[in-house]
Amino acid sequence: MKSNRIFSSFLFLFLLTACSSPTIPAAPAGKPGDILYQEEFEKNTTGWDRVSNDNGIMDYDSGGYRILIKQPEFNLWSTPEKDFGDVRVEADVFRLNGPTENRQGLMCRYQHGDYYFFIISNDGYYAIGKFIGGQTLLLGQTAMQPSEFIQKEAVNHLRADCTGNSLTFYINYDQVASAQDTDFKNGDVGLLAGAFSQAGVDVLFDHFTVIQP
């Protein structure tokens, strides 16, 4: 079982300094089931980060959004610069290459460097947590937990429900965890990936959708 120590380096590369981020207007809420935002990554002009440096790559690739981590104990993330309240966030993710011990997942309620995360590792573990004030805290669990629903060599469909104080994580359409937290009420959504002790994590996201719960 993975221990809490793996989260000691769960510090993300901030491509824009949080304190200088522009104010993002709130997106209008819709009716339950309405699609609030959708990205298929077919065009590279929709505003997601395009980065290539010694730390990694984030870019549109092959009709998806690729994140490659070149450094151990390192993470990258990207957001579309939106502001939502309650959301249901979904995406497909596939490991292209690299170690099966990795991090890949969804974010919600990102504000000024703080957010909730929902992650899996291709060796069969998952977690719900939050990044707040420079610290990573797991929610409803003390370590990443195993799940039989994680496909180790295939596409995984991830879903994160952020509704009121409730956070619920689904992997391949099966609920694996839920937690309660009151710190964040609204914010941006996004995708993230990271490496543990071995660099080279290379994943491709697609079919990113934000739905009114």
Residues covered by each model-derived region:
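C-terminal motif of bacterial Sec signal peptides marking the signal peptidase cleavage site
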Residues: 17-18
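Extracellular carbohydrate-recognition regions
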Residues: 26-50
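Short, aromatic/His-centered strand-loop micro-motif at the edge of beta-sheets
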Residues: 134-157
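Localized edge beta-strand/strand-to-loop motifs within extracellular or lumenal beta-rich domains
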Residues: 154-168
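Flexible glycan-contacting loops in extracellular carbohydrate-active proteins
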Residues: 179-206
